[in-house]
UniProtKB/Swiss-Prot annotation:
Start-end of Basic and acidic residues biased regions: 108-118
Organism: Shewanella denitrificans (strain OS217 / ATCC BAA-1090 / DSM 15013)
UniProt main location, coarse: membrane
Classification lineage: Bacteria, Pseudomonadati, Pseudomonadota, Gammaproteobacteria, Alteromonadales
UniProt similarity note: Belongs to the ZipA family.
Subcellular location(s) of the protein: Cell inner membrane
Periplasmic-facing ranges: 1-6
Protein name according to UniProt: Cell division protein ZipA
């Protein structure tokens, strides 16, 4: 019995150790490798895939990076080699010419510079001649562009028509069936403006007075601006009228006269004008709504009294009260 327990204990320990080892191995396998190890592994695998000459199975060699400027262009090498060889020949020629003519090397710098410049000019001419001997392909592109430009200008250029040329445009011919016979236009009945119905004989007159306080007068220079601000207009009988239109057009609603005889105004001499008061009157029946017209007249009288420092009186020259207003409204309703 004790042996069996020992065997089971050993087997359990081995199983636990195996599980732990397998767990650590799985965790380590799942962890990403460091960058250095991966790069090293890639380099080793890449080297194993290539042969001794550096080519893989597809015959592709390793990538080589070439630094810029390590190799000159062929054209530059050709152009630089020609002047060097020519200059060497030119220097040898200069030395031969100097020895043949007996020139001493102790010449001044200015005297020696002139033949060198001449020889260099000759050398440049020789190089230019050698370069010009190479065949040069003509560039017809510029000529082609000019030709196309000329053609475009010719096509765009407008054609002027002289007076001697006549352009004949044929009018479309229509059959007899397409010609519609003109139908006489139906006469339009012009609606004449309706004339307002005559008001008839006046049946009543509503009167309001605006009178200055005792011992005072209303000055014309102050009265005229107030009348104009209230839309009064100077008109017939040399008095002011309030029209249905604020601009001074339309039917007369009520009028305003001087309370003193002869009851008229002179707009040209309003600065020298003065009076004890003015009177407003409205005849019944009147144009429009009588109650509305009376309301405008009453408001105008009260506004003038406030502006001129005066008082409003009724037709009997008594102080205006609410009782007088109700009496005037009753008279309006009796006629309308």
């Amino acid at each position: 019995m004790e042996d069996l327990q020992l065997v089971l204990f050993v087997l359990g320990a081995i199983a636990i150790i195996a599980v732990l080892v397998h767990g650590f191995w799985s965790i380590r396998k799942q962890q990403p490798k460091p960058i250095k190890e991966r790069t090293r592994a890639q380099n080793i695998s890449e080297a194993q895939r290539r042969d001794s000459q550096g080519f893989d199975a597809d015959g592709i060699g390793a990538v080589r990076v070439r630094k810029p400027g390590t190799e000159d262009l062929p054209s530059s090498r050709n152009h630089t080699s020609v002047p060097v060889m020519t200059l060497q020949k030119a220097s040898a020629t200069d030395a031969g010419v100097a020895s043949s003519h007996g020139y001493s090397p102790e010449r001044t710098t200015a005297e020696r510079a002139e033949p060198v410049r001449a020889e260099r000019a000759a050398t440049n001419a020789t190089v230019a001649g050698s370069m010009n001997t190479q065949p040069v392909t003509p560039q017809p592109a510029s000529y082609g562009v000019q030709g196309v430009t000329a053609e475009v200008k010719q096509s765009v250029e407008p054609q002027t028509i002289t007076p001697s040329q006549h352009v004949h445009i044929e009018s479309p011919k229509y059959g007899a069936t397409t010609q519609a016979s003109p139908q006489p236009a139906s006469p339009v009945q012009s609606q004449a403006p309706r004339e307002p119905e005559p008001l008839g004989e006046p049946q009543d007159v509503l009167v309001l007075h605006v009178v200055a306080h005792e011992g005072q007068e209303i000055q014309g220079a102050e009265l005229l601006p107030c009348l104009l601000s209230l839309n009064f207009k100077f008109g017939d009988m040399n008095i002011f009228h309030r029209h249905s239109d604020n601009a001074g057009n339309g039917k007369v609603l009520f009028s305003l006269a001087n309370m003193m005889k002869p009851g008229v105004f002179d707009p040209d001499n309003m600065e020298q004008f003065c009076t004890q008061g003015i009177v407003m009157f409205m005849t019944l029946p009147c144009h429009g709504e009588a109650q509305h017209n009376f309301s405008i007249m009453l408001n105008s009288a009260e506004q003038l009294a406030d502006d001129l420092g005066a008082i409003v009186l009724d037709e009997q020259r008594k102080v205006w009260t609410e009782h007088n207003k109700q009496d005037y409204l009753r008279r309006i309703k009796a006629i309308v």
